Amino acid sequence: MKTQMIRSLTFQDGNAEVAMNFYVELFEDSRVLKVSRWPEGGPVEKGKIMQATFELNGNLFMCSDSPPAHEWDFTPAVSNYIECDNMTEVKRLFSRLSEDGTVTMPLNDYGFSSCFGWVIIK
């Protein structure tokens, strides 16, 4: 069995490159691995991301500028969970992810965790 059998794939509605670069710059040991772009005459603007794979601190993710308009969007029912080694890193990441986002649970002790926060990013 592969080390990471399940990967996140997000459809970004034209913002895949911005989102991918934001994450790669935010997390240490991260990089873009592969980018395939839509050609001229494709279902979306030429150069938009058909499919991209990137690595965030050893974990693989994928994104796409999906061409059809979907009735669905991101949902908090499926979320990415970040674990940090120290409070400095927790605060740095939470602060950056909260910029222009919606904090649904500020960093706090909620009983099930001494330091937990939940943010819906931009």
Regions found by a protein language model. Name each.
Residues 9-58:
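Core segments of cupin and vicinal oxygen chelate
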Residues 46-47, 73-75:
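Short glycine/proline-enriched turns and hinge-like loops at secondary-structure junctions
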Residues 2-5, 9-11, 33, 55, ...:
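Vicinal oxygen chelate
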